Structure formats: structure tokens, C-alpha cells
Amino acid sequence: MGNHIANSLNCIVIGAGIAGACTAASLARRGWQVTVVDAADPPASGASGLPVGLYAPYISADNNFTSQISAVGVQFTQKLARRLLLEGVDWQPSGVMTRKYGEPEQWHADAGWIKPAALVQACLSQANITWRGNCRVKRLVQNGEIWTLFDNDDQVLQQADMLVITASNQSADLLQDVPHAPKLNFQAVRGQVTYGNLKETKTSPQHPTHPINGGGSYIETDTQWLIGATYDRDNLSLEPSIRDQVDNFERLENLVPDIAEQLKPTFERGLVKNWVGIRCATTDRLPIVGEIMQGLWVCTAMASRGLTFAPLCAELLAGLLHHEALPLNARLVKALSIQRYMRK
């Protein structure tokens, strides 16, 4: 791999969500010329188009892999946000309070909210990165050390020495015809959030100064509030659902009853907005990061924790590629590795 890096620093990243944008930024900082391609016109058109989301640690009784990785992930996310985003507008290191029924509240100081599209745009605006939208990749072909991307008309879209697939649920489709590539069985999970204008909550005497998490999340930014999200494997429609809007109001009642009372007339009059995205999850709920074969890497399947996982996973990929000291211990690197699918 060292010789491969020495001979060329030209790379394509397929997918312009949080994972793809963070991966592109990590590689570009190390001198790579990165082209990011996506089937959509603007970046962050998939699940990363969420109006606002949380980065926060996941707490488990047994301190499982997800807990350990998320604890490191929030540090990388916060570092990246401080460098690229405008505090109070694009993100806020506000801390997050977790409330779960029958359990004491937990305060997470190293957590907060981020507008994912702002993070994606900021990453793609870095030096050494070129953005190409409306590029629907049909198949990948390796010829020697060169990877070629073809579109639906079998026309060449782009060529490079290295390719990183960060295309969420489409990653499995792109790999299916690549010889010796693993078969990835992702779970597509629909999520709907409900949101509106923040001024509708400002009269609340218990107006929260930080997001509330647990069985859903309630977030307030500089201009809006948001509650969600649903988790649905059976319905993958991108059309908003009234049923899910009702479910989100029930989440709000459980998390922040005072705010729910303030917003009840807004919900009843149908004056709220809804956003729907499709997450990409593995069966073990951990992302996939690593090298499939020379010049072909993957960094995807962030599920509902893209803001917590993606900056860390991007740095892990770059660290593996460049033989750097890694941000995770060997057990956690193995837990995320594509090799867990290569063996099957």
C-alpha cells in the first residue's frame, strides 16, 4: 500500500453524505486530490439531509463496542465542527441530556447538535476536493491499478487510482459485480422527524437550553425545533406519514411535556413540517470501514449515528491507508473492519 500511495494521490469518493464528505476531507488533508461523486444534484441529499441532528455518546450497561466507539467519535466530531462550522448557527456544543423511563438522567457535556448539510458542505469546500453531482454510478471496473466508474449508458464517468465507497444502502449494489468483493446485507431503515419554527416554544417556562435525548430526541437550534425520529424497516417510502407525525408528538410528550403542551395546537392544525430519510444499518449496528482490495475501500453504514461516527471513521480509514497511529484500539478497529464480512 505504501508504494500505491507514493505513486499516486488521486481518489474518487462515491457518496456525498456525511461519511463521504468526512472521508474526502480526511484524505484531502493528507494531500490526496479527491473527486466526490453522487447521483443527486446537491450534496447531503439522502439521510444526511436531516435538518439537524445530535452527536452524542451511546451509553450501555456493558460498555459495548458501540459505546466505546461513540465515546471516541464525539471527540472527533467536535474537533471537526470547531474547525469548519460556525458555532451557534451550524452547530452548538451545548451538551445533551439523556432521559430514559425509570432511569436517572445522564448529562453528556461532550455532545451537541449539528446541521448535517452544513458539515457536508464545509467538508467538500476544503482544498483538494472536487464535487460532481448528477453522477449516477452503475458499475465499477478495475484495470491494472486504475478504477473506472461507468454510468447507466456505459459511459465513463471518472477514473482514479483509489476508490472509496460511502454510498449508504447503494454501496452493496456497487460491489455486487466486483470480483472477490463481500456481499453486504444492509438493513434500510426509514426515519421521519417533525420540526417547526422555534418562536412557537419561546413562551415555555421550562425552555431547554440543550437537546433532550432518549427514545427519540428533541433539539432546538438558533431558528427551529425538531423531534424524532421514527425507526421503520417495513415502510421505506420517502413520503411523510401522518402516523409518524403523531408518533413524534408522543415522543415529545414523553421527553419534554411542557414543550409538547406549547406545540400541541401547532400539531393539531397541521402547521408542522416533516422530513424523511432512509438510514443504512448493519446487523450489528456498527459502521464498515476498511480495504476490500488494492485501491478499493469502503466507509459506510453509519445508521442513525452518522454525526457521531463519520468523522472518526474517516480518520480511521485515512490512518489505515497511511499506516498512521490509529484513533481506536485494535479490538475496536477489528469490530468496524470490512474483514468481518470478507470472512463469510
Model-derived regions: residue spans:
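Core beta-strand elements of the Rossmann-like FAD/NAD(P) dinucleotide-binding domain
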Residues: 6-9, 152-162
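N-terminal Rossmann-like FAD-binding beta1-loop-alpha1 element of flavoenzymes
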Residues: 9-36
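Short hydrophobic core segments
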Residues: 12-14, 37, 158-170, 314
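Active-site substrate-recognition segment that forms the wall
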Residues: 22-30, 39, 47-54, 59, ...
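Dinucleotide-binding Rossmann-like beta1-alpha1 core, especially the glycine-rich loop
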Residues: 52-111
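Mid-domain beta-loop-alpha active-site segment that forms a flexible
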Residues: 107-126, 168-170, 244-251, 313
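C-terminal catalytic lobe of FAD-dependent flavoproteins
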Residues: 110-111, 263-344
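A conserved short coil-to-beta-strand element within the FAD-binding core of flavoproteins
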Residues: 133-148
